[in-house]
Swiss-Prot record:
<feature type="transmembrane region" description="Helical; Name=1">
    <location>
        <begin position="8"/>
        <end position="32"/>
    </location>
</feature>
<comment type="function">
    <text>Photoreceptor required for image-forming vision at low light intensity. While most salt water fish species use retinal as chromophore, most freshwater fish use 3-dehydroretinal, or a mixture of retinal and 3-dehydroretinal. Light-induced isomerization of 11-cis to all-trans retinal triggers a conformational change that activates signaling via G-proteins. Subsequent receptor phosphorylation mediates displacement of the bound G-protein alpha subunit by arrestin and terminates signaling.</text>
</comment>
<feature type="transmembrane region" description="Helical; Name=2">
    <location>
        <begin position="45"/>
        <end position="67"/>
    </location>
</feature>
<feature type="topological domain" description="Extracellular">
    <location>
        <begin position="246"/>
        <end position="257"/>
    </location>
</feature>
<feature type="topological domain" description="Cytoplasmic">
    <location>
        <begin position="33"/>
        <end position="44"/>
    </location>
</feature>
<feature type="disulfide bond">
    <location>
        <begin position="81"/>
        <end position="158"/>
    </location>
</feature>
<feature type="transmembrane region" description="Helical; Name=6">
    <location>
        <begin position="224"/>
        <end position="245"/>
    </location>
</feature>
<keyword id="KW-0157">Chromophore</keyword>
<dbReference type="Pfam" id="PF00001">
    <property type="entry name" value="7tm_1"/>
</dbReference>
<dbReference type="GO" id="GO:0005886">
    <property type="term" value="C:plasma membrane"/>
</dbReference>
<keyword id="KW-0449">Lipoprotein</keyword>
<dbReference type="GO" id="GO:0097381">
    <property type="term" value="C:photoreceptor disc membrane"/>
</dbReference>
<feature type="topological domain" description="Cytoplasmic">
    <location>
        <begin position="280"/>
        <end position="289"/>
    </location>
</feature>
<feature type="transmembrane region" description="Helical; Name=5">
    <location>
        <begin position="174"/>
        <end position="195"/>
    </location>
</feature>
<keyword id="KW-1133">Transmembrane helix</keyword>
<dbReference type="GO" id="GO:0016056">
    <property type="term" value="P:G protein-coupled opsin signaling pathway"/>
</dbReference>
<feature type="topological domain" description="Cytoplasmic">
    <location>
        <begin position="196"/>
        <end position="223"/>
    </location>
</feature>
Length: 289
């Protein structure tokens, strides 16, 4: 054991709780949306994709981590490490890029930067495909030699190798690529879209350009997506910050808990995203009941 055995027991219990809540609530989101035709809107397609990404994290990542925490180290070998790292990374990236597509959808619908443009089912499907392409573009390279997945923190889960400059893996270039393309760029797009969106909502309210009912509906949807983005940032920024610090200070002495805490804090979006969706979407709640 790298740390007190009680820490592994606590980690296993935490992962069990995430699975116990995360699987049913994401599966319920998928089932209810597919079961009720009126929920099959372009916006909800993207939210469905978010649930699929969360299920990848729950089934491919959380279950593995719970099992290995019971043994005190990663017992599943190189193949298991690659699979766990791949599914956890893919799920997280699909969720992030789904939030990017949601932000763009909100910007187009509310701000109307393109006159007479309507966000349709085809556009939503293109957004879904884009999120998967970007997710795979981040999760696949470590499987084929550009960086690698290694056990991290308390050695019960696997992630991208921020820690070493292992010869032949080009870890430095991949980490820089990942931080720029798969973190800074999507966050910049999200902040731009919501900055414009908030301005447009205030201007519309002041000018009374749309009916009160339409304004209220757009505000509710926008509020739901903004809360999802804030929640995502609260969970992922600590992990990204610690990972970048480790990358920039390789060779520094830090304990296994230092990376473990932000890593497992970052797994909570798999639970709260569908909870936000259910709590703030009246139509979905009615269909669920």
């Amino acid at each position: 054991y790298l740390v007190n055995p009680a820490a592994y027991a606590a980690l296993g219990a935490y992962m069990f709780l995430l699975i116990l809540i995360g699987f049913p609530i994401n599966f319920l989101t998928l089932y209810v949306t597919l079961e009720h035709k009126k929920l099959r809107t372009p916006l909800n397609y993207i939210l469905l994709n978010l649930a699929v990404g969360n299920l990848f994290m729950v089934l491919g990542g959380f279950t593995t981590t719970m099992y290995t925490s019971m043994h005190g180290y990663f017992v599943l070998g190189r193949l298991g490490c690659n699979l766990e790292g791949f599914f956890a990374t893919l799920g997280g990236e699909i969720a992030l890029w789904s939030l990017v597509v949601l932000a763009i959808e909100r910007w187009i619908v509310v701000c109307k930067p393109i006159s007479k443009f309507r966000f349709t089912e085809d556009h939503a499907i293109m957004g879904l495909a884009f999120s998967w392409v970007m997710g795979l573009a981040c999760a696949v390279p470590p499987l084929v030699g550009w960086s690698r997945y290694i056990p991290e923190g308390m050695k019960c889960s696997c992630g991208v190798d921020y820690y070493t400059r292992a010869e032949g893996f080009n870890n430095e270039s991949f980490v820089i690529y990942m931080f720029i393309v798969h973190f800074l760029i999507p966050l910049s797009v999200i902040f731009f879209c919501y900055g414009r969106l908030l301005c447009a909502v205030k201007e519309a309210a002041a000018a009374q350009q749309e009916s009160e009912t339409t304004q209220r509906a757009e505000k509710e949807v926008s509020r739901m997506v903004v809360i999802m983005v804030i929640g995502f940032l609260v969970c992922w920024l600590p992990y990204a910050s610690v990972a970048w610090w480790i990358f920039c200070n390789q060779g520094s002495d830090f304990g296994p808990i230092f990376m473990t805490l932000p890593s497992f804090f970052a797994k909570r979006p798999a639970i709260y995203n569908p909870m936000i969706y259910i709590c703030m979407n009246k139509q979905f709640r009615h269909c669920m009941i």
